[in-house]
Amino acid sequence: MAEINSLTELSVVTNTAETHENIAPVHVQKLDSQGRAYATGKRKDAVARVWIKPGSGKITINNKEFDKYFARPVLRMILRQPIVATNRDTQFDIIATVAGGGLSGQAGAVRHGISKALTYYEPELRTILKKGGFLTRDSRVVERKKYGKAKARRSFQFSKR
């Protein structure tokens, strides 16, 4: 870095620094060679790898239809939230592989992955998804068990006599 010798040189440097701060980050479309957007989603111990591509609205999870993989309607609703919020129900085919955790964590991980992949495919959807809270990683995990306790917080039964 060059040394600054006068106030005019200092003002030039500070003015350029201020303009860089005011510029909003430009989000560009991120696609692979096959025209798909890829993202990973996480929730609890589950990790989902999600690809989206233009299609008819078919959702495949671990090579199964999503309503076969997630039998409970609540889990299917969780998974479809970002697609419904952006009105892209029938525009994209979604392929996901998910591992780890239970079904609830896996549904949350796929939802997170779908949201991120949608922003990579259509960056203008970012504001809708951000407002809905779909792009935020849910960091809540199981609290660890402590020694001297029955569970994380539950104490052993206390007997006075």
UniProtKB/Swiss-Prot annotation:
Stored Pfam families: Ribosomal_S9
Gene Ontology MF term list: RNA binding; structural constituent of ribosome
Record GO biological process: translation
Entry keywords, A to Z: Ribonucleoprotein, Ribosomal protein
A Gene Ontology cellular-component term: cytosolic small ribosomal subunit
Family membership noted in the UniProt record: Belongs to the universal ribosomal protein uS9 family.
Record protein name field: Small ribosomal subunit protein uS9
Species the sequence originates in: Bartonella henselae (strain ATCC 49882 / DSM 28221 / CCUG 30454 / Houston 1) (Rochalimaea henselae)
